[in-house]
């Protein structure tokens, strides 16, 4: 997608008095909520997980927003909440507290918060990524000691989102997220032994609370398009080598500035390739 429909929320200040924290335990069996308890959940995901991530900084063009997350969810470790009986509005940053153990000195943890519709489609609400070597200090990162317990609080991106009644909230955890994260030099397995998700729940209604003023823009430039704009976003799989790649192409087409006659044309190709068998062959 290139955009999502939404509404405006108006707050007198932040933090808002209409936002309250709600904690959901990560429970055995993959439940999000419930009584929680001790876990022994291994997390080790394939290097090519993440092709549905979209652009890191989307501008609203050419399907730059994250797509259906169901495929990436299937390759992740997921905790899923009960079917919502009423809409749930989120405003702010969700926080994920975990106790983790790594079997390697270098590892990542990635968390995606998703809205799962009754038909199974999954929309990414927010995500967070952490190089666990930075978990104690970003200024002085240090290698992990395999087997040691690591207490982590991962703050996800700020979000403003409303889940509909009948949908579910899903937390998807992974150790990889290509191409947002470069692969670790060797696959790490994390063991999750305890966790809780803290949600910023907003108490506002469904109606828009603010109407923005009409946008102001410069006069449209005087031009003629000689050939159309084309955009391509595809995933390639080499069935011989096993390599997978995200390919993004943007062809501007030929455009003439009618004020002075300059004709321009631009072509852009991006390729993000990863080898599931060898992280050192990652290419971008």
Give the location of each predicted region.
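C-terminal, loop-rich substrate-recognition/catalytic regions characterized by aromatic stacking residues
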Residues: 1-284
């Amino acid at each position: 997608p290139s955009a999502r429909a939404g509404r405006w929320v108006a707050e007198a200040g932040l933090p808002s008095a209409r936002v309250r924290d709600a904690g959901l335990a990560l429970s055995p069996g993959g439940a999000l909520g419930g009584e929680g308890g001790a876990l022994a959940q291994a997390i080790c995901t394939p290097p090519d997980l993440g092709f549905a991530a979209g652009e890191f900084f989307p501008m609203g063009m050419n399907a730059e927003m994250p797509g259906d997350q169901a495929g990436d969810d299937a390759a992740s470790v997921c905790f899923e909440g009960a079917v919502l009986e009423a809409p749930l509005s989120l405003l702010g940053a969700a926080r994920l507290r975990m106790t983790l153990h790594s079997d390697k000195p270098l590892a990542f943890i990635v968390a995606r918060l998703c809205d799962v519709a009754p038909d199974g489609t999954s929309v990414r609400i927010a995500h967070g990524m952490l190089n666990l070597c930075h978990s104690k200090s970003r200024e002085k990162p240090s290698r992990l000691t395999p087997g040691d317990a690591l207490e982590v609080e991962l703050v996800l991106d700020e979000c403003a989102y409303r889940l509909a009644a009948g949908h579910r909230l899903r937390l998807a955890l992974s150790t990889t997220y290509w191409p947002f994260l470069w692969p670790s030099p060797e696959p790490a397995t994390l063991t999750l032994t305890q966790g809780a998700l803290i949600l910023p729940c907003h108490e506002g209604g469904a109606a828009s609370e603010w109407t923005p003023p009409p946008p102001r823009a410069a006069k449209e430039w005087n031009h003629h398009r000689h050939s159309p704009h084309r955009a391509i976003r595809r995933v390639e799989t080499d069935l011989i080598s096993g390599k997978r790649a995200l390919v993004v192409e943007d062809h501007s087409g030929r455009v003439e500035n009618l004020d002075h006659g300059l004709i321009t044309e631009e072509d852009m190709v991006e390729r993000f390739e990863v080898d599931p068998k060898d992280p050192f062959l990652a290419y971008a």
